[in-house]
Amino acid sequence: MYVDAHGDFNDTNTSPTGNIHGECLAASAGLGLPDLTNLYFEGQKVDPHNICFVGCRDLDPGEKVLMKKAGVTVFAMSVIDRQGFSEIVKKVLKFFEIHADWIHVSFDMDVLDPMYAPGTGIPLPGGLTNREALLQMGEMASIGNVLSAGIVLVRPSLDV
């Protein structure tokens, strides 16, 4: 599960900036330059059909196309706002019931609205509340098959 304001699903053809940190998830899915896709071992690390993305609100146009083409499941903030967070949590849990025996959660602090957590590298208004994030992580922990998790892009010097 990828919880992030940004897609990190660009490749060299879709990235408007060329920043490598915007290509890491696509590279893990086997898309992009061989120098990235073949780190540690050759080829795909994660089947993109098993990626569930929650909370994005700043996707590049080419990145959106690449995610859709690859089969990534995306619950953008616009979808969360329309359907309600509790409904999306149910859909995420159902997704993992079908798609994964074990789950890694990547939680980027910029998924949170900077009103609640400004201590991140790329703050972007319109994100999850702290309560929504706690609910999501609590529900993920309760299903019992989260094998690992990482909390990334934390900048305490900018936090309150």
Where do the protein language model's features map onto the residues?
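Active-site flanking residues adjacent to catalytic metal/cofactor-binding acidic residues
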Residues: 3-5, 54, 105-109
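Aromatic-lined glycan-binding groove of carbohydrate-active enzymes
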Residues: 48-50, 57-62, 99-103
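Conserved beta-strand scaffold positions in the cores of enzyme catalytic domains, especially
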Residues: 2, 51-53, 74, 148
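Solvent-exposed alpha-helices and their adjacent loops that cap or buttress functional pockets
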Residues: 18, 42-46
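Catalytic cores of soluble, metal-dependent hydrolases
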Residues: 66-69, 73-160
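A general structural motif
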Residues: 32, 52-60, 129-131
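Active-site histidine-anchored catalytic micro-motif
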Residues: 1-38, 143-147
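Short, glycine/acidic-enriched loop or turn micro-motifs at the edges of active sites
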Residues: 7, 58, 109-113
